[in-house]
């Protein structure tokens, strides 16, 4: 395992000084079998047999007590422990069994030199224990930075921040962890792994969602529940976000997908300012009605978030007193996810895995991987996504490159341009673990086989990281020639996976296709094996279809015929070339015949206006070679690649590397203004519309903006600087007292890519500093961000100063706690619910 240690060391995966250095899974397979340290009462909670009552908001109580939370409220545990303990006691007295200590932002990045993480956690947990609560929960919130590839913080840096908190909390005597208010699924994963790998305390994990029912990165409650359940948290749920009534549909979605108990800690509605104080719209009686409905549906852990106080918690404690939770028996979902897209299977459903990011037999891809040309690989990912694949295979298996490092890079890059789940394809467990560790979502590993060495190496990785896994029907003796032999190997793999607690819904058996040209008799055996595996083992199947035609002419015809036969035998996930029209037709038709395409709506939409000759012609024209530069169009697209040399497609799909050539060709016949106003701007408008409709999420939005910027840069370089002169300047800041800057940083990146000059003043910014920037740079538009209700006053003060000293300046505001009503109350001109809205405001105010 020295290779893995070297990779982790070279890529920064070494914990902070004094921490516990992470042991690779393969050196300690038992680490995948997590045993939780807790008492029997908590064990009953984790089994879903007992209710558990958390406390409510800390910030709300600090405000009511008249305490100034300041920029680092966690420091109050050191400077004013009596008041913090007093707040905990108030919650305990009304029925809170768990107090959440005041450590939400107590990570090294936020604390800086103000205090050590260990000291803050020790003081906070001492306050919690002094309250007499049954359990003390160590609170772990977001780092305040956006993780790569969208942001700048490496996964391992986030992991180290969380690991330091975990070790400090465990050493100080915490009873459990509550990882909360997470909006980035990858950041949540880093925190969960830090907790799993550095402690054996129970892990409660909750995410926060917007009004559209997704996080700002596009994660739905269903996906969150699937991924967190697979990662092995003990309780999952939702906190903050919205009021309890607004959360009900999201909680219902989680309850249907979560295999562990579900918790809810809602806000007391939306905040507003009355007489200079923050008040919330939902009173305790209305709050408890919504919570009661969620409890009746299956929620078993309750508490409160922003705006709640002991009055709310008292009603929750009374609600569940003397009751047992609703019995829930949720089968694990069968399928895989990215952060924003789930490919799930039920009944006879089928899903396709795009095969084109695999260097075997592909000279161009091999050359691209050797040269580090990831743009070519991203083109393949986008092409397959547009063509309708349900997942993408990613393989970097070349002996002359660093496979682990390349695979890690590919995973991050591909997840930035494609929403599809990925199949991590490698025979090297080191590379597999490196890639799945930084994957956002639930991937599938390809593969494990029947050799004991392989089982011992790969299955612990699949369990620890919550992955599905492909099992190859081969062992030390090779590939059995008969269906019975293949089945025997598959059975061994499934039984070994059972020992690790890997559910059968996460196991996909590959019965291994042999070439009909050399192993003709085995083709029928493969089909028999698929049926046996499905019927006797209760697992799904996967198959690399194109191998069957090796050595034969007109390979696509052979592959297509075999694909149809395999579907009939029970194949669930074929690995194929999605650019082939013939394959797509077979998949679309099978989905009608097996009932997956209800009422044949998808089939009718795709083929109603096509003649048989047109379909046959398309099938004949498509080959298994395909073309990454000329992908099949996605449904509903009307790209005219001839008229604009692919420019609109490249912007919409975020293909930054393709932009220089497309723009240069357009400039041969168009002037710069025509390229901008006739092509680039409409393409960005298209992207914005897709974002508003929920078809695109933040990663796609940012990738498209970067592609557009690449186009603007070419115009500048070729003498069109006048046409792309600075579109205007905007100053942005996180207001005084608030040290959270994820949202602000996203706005900065987007606006810069749209061509605006952005003066980013940082976080915890004094009102005077904003005014100084406005005066120095003649700023006409200012953007302000706040995450916490306790810091909205800083936003109001900044706007008041600007109104007095620079009345012509327009102000837009945003942030987790900000609403349109709030924006109006603090005197802002515009409310921006997301980064895309800020780009619209810039266009309106700055006229560009």
Predicted regions and their residues:
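Domain-level signal for soluble alpha/beta catalytic cores
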Residues: 2-508, 514-848
């Amino acid at each position: 395992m020295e290779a893995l240690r070297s990779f982790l060391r070279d890529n920064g995966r070494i914990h902070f000084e004094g921490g516990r250095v992470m042991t690779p899974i393969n050196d300690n397979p038992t680490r995948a079998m997590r045993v939780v340290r807790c008492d029997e009462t908590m064990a009953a909670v984790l089994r879903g047999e007992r209710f558990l009552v958390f406390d409510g908001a800390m910030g709300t109580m600090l405000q009511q007590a008249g305490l100034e939370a300041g920029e680092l409220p966690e420091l109050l545990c050191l400077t004013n422990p009596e008041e913090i303990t007093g707040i905990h006691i108030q919650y305990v007295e009304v029925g809170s069994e768990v107090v959440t200590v005041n450590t939400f932002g107590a990570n090294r990045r936020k604390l800086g030199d103000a205090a050590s993480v260990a000291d803050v956690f020790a003081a906070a947990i001492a306050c919690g224990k002094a309250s007499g609560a049954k359990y003390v929960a160590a609170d772990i919130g977001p780092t305040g930075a956006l993780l790569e590839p969208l942001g700048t913080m490496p996964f391992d840096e986030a992991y180290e921040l969380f690991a330091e908190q975990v070790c400090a909390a465990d050493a100080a005597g915490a009873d459990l962890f509550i990882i909360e208010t997470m909006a980035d699924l990858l950041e949540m994963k880093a925190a969960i792994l830090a907790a799993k790998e550095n402690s054996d305390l129970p892990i409660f994990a909750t995410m926060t969602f917007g009004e559209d029912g997704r996080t700002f990165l596009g994660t739905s409650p269903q996906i969150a529940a699937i991924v967190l359940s697979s990662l092995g948290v003990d309780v999952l749920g939702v906190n903050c976000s919205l009021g309890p009534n607004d959360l009900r549909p999201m909680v219902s979605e989680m309850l249907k997908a979560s295999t562990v108990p579900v918790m809810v800690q809602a806000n007391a509605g939306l905040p507003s300012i009355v007489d200079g104080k923050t008040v919330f719209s939902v009173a305790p009686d209305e709050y408890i009605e919504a919570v009661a409905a969620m409890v009746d549906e299956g929620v078993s852990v309750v508490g409160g978030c922003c705006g709640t106080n002991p009055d709310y918690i008292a009603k929750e404690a009374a609600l569940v007193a003397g009751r047992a939770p609703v019995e829930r028996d949720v089968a694990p979902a069968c399928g895989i996810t990215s952060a924003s897209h789930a490919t799930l299977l039920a009944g006879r459903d089928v899903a396709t895995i795009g095969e084109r990011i695999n260097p075997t037999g592909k000279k161009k891809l091999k050359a691209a991987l050797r040269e580090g040309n990831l743009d070519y690989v991203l083109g393949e990912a986008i092409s397959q996504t547009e063509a309708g694949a349900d997942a993408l295979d990613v393989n970097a298996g070349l002996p002359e490159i660093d496979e682990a490092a390349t695979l890690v890079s590919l995973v991050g890059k591909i997840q930035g341009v494609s929403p599809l789940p990925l199949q991590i394809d490698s025979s090297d467990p080191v590379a597999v673990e490196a890639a799945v560790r930084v994957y956002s979502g639930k991937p599938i590993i390809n593969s494990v086989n029947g050799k004991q060495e392989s089982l011992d190496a790969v299955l612990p990785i699949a369990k620890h990281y919550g992955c599905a896994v492909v099992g190859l029907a081969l062992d030390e003796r090779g590939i059995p020639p008969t269906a019975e032999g293949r089945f025997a190997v598959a059975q061994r793999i499934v039984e070994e996976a059972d020992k690790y607690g890997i559910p059968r819904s996460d196991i996909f058996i590959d019965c291994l296709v042999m070439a009909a040209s050399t192993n003709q008799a085995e083709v029928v055996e493969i089909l028999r094996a698929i049926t046996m595996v499905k019927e006797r083992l209760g697992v799904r199947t996967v198959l690399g279809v194109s191998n069957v035609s090796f050595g034969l002419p007109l390979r696509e015809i052979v592959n297509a015929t075999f694909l149809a036969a395999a579907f009939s035998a029970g194949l669930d996930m074929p690995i194929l070339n999605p650019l082939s029209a013939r394959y797509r037709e077979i998949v679309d038709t099978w989905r009608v015949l097996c009932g997956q395409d209800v009422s044949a709506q998808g089939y009718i939409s795709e083929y109603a206006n096509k003649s048989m000759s047109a379909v046959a012609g398309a099938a004949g024209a498509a080959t298994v070679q395909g073309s990454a530069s000329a992908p099949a169009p996605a449904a509903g697209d009307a790209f005219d690649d001839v008229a604009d040399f692919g420019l609109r497609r490249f912007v919409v799909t975020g293909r930054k590397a393709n932009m220089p050539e497309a723009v240069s060709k357009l400039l041969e016949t168009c002037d710069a203004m025509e390229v901008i106003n006739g092509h680039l701007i409409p393409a960005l408008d298209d992207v914005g519309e897709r974002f508003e409709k929920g078809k695109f999420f933040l990663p796609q939005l940012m990738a498209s903006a970067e592609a557009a910027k690449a186009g603007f840069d070419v115009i500048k370089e070729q003498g069109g600087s006048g046409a792309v002169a600075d579109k205007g300047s905007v100053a942005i800041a996180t207001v005084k007292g608030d040290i959270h800057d994820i949202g602000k940083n996203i706005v900065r990146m987007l606006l810069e890519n749209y061509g605006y000059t952005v003066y980013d003043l940082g976080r915890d910014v004094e009102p005077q500093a904003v005014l100084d920037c406005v005066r120095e740079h003649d700023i006409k538009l200012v953007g302000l961000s706040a995450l916490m209700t306790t810091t909205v006053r800083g936003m109001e003060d900044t706007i008041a100063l600007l109104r007095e000293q620079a009345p012509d300046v327009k102000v837009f505001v945003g942030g987790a706690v900000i609403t349109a009503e709030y924006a109006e109350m603090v005197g802002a001109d515009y409310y921006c619910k997301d980064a895309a809205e800020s780009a619209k405001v810039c266009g309106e105010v700055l006229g560009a």
